[in-house]
């Protein structure tokens, strides 16, 4: 039924912990494909799991997107699921999704909500994806309301037909793939309103300068490829500011406030002004507002 694709680089302990967590799945209708992205120390897995585990090692570093594409090519099952080595599936995810597919066999793409854990701040919130009938470029250019790769399942044949993930991008690969899905005339989507993935987020973990440079390049690429109408231009202008604000917000930087204020000037939404003020006063408090916004 499923091939679960896990890209990993120099995180052997996390890979082993992830595999242990998958033992708790209520059904074992899946294989796991670990794509070792040319780590200095190769991933080694002992064959003691109640499901098949395959390990493939890239000869050169391909990045997360390229490694997921490699895993997709190696997959032997009809459906692809994606999991990062520091995230988790709900214990019933594979069972719930397989039951949904049996009920709606015409679909080729499935997505669901997620439980997001803010590790340092010690709180959680849940994503709210849009309904399938609202999936279009206008909506996804305004905000990625499909989610990242751990919130998606896709038929291998559809994934290959779409060209997989863009391995040239160093940022926003998940978002660009969501736009690719939304833009496809062959999309047959299904939605499960359950948080079937648990994603962990850490503030002050990454480089602001590197992230900003890569993200700005990705934004430029996405705008050139997908923005065609005036409405799409307006929507993506707002979302681009939000994407850039997120980098600073996750690093607890007051610079996030300037981006939220720019969003407010475009949206005239008092919520954005409120977040701008809170971000300037206390970036940490602004992160905690995710509980409510």
Indicate residue ranges for each PLM-predicted region:
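Cell-envelope/extracellular polymer assembly enzymes that use nucleotide-activated donors
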Residues: 1-3, 21, 31, 176
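A conserved hydrophobic helix/loop-capping motif in glycosyltransferases and polysaccharide synthases
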Residues: 2-14, 18, 25, 35
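Acidic donor-binding segment of Leloir-type glycosyltransferases
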Residues: 19-57
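Glycine-rich, basic loop-to-helix element that forms the pyrophosphate-binding segment
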Residues: 58-75
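Flexible acidic/His/Gly-enriched loops in nucleotide-sugar-dependent glycosyltransferase catalytic domains
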Residues: 66, 94-158
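Short aromatic/hydrophobic "clamp" motif used to bind/position activated sugar donors
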Residues: 80
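Conserved nucleotide-sugar donor-binding catalytic segment
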Residues: 131-216
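Catalytic core of nucleotide-sugar-dependent glycosyltransferases
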Residues: 194-203, 207-235, 254-266
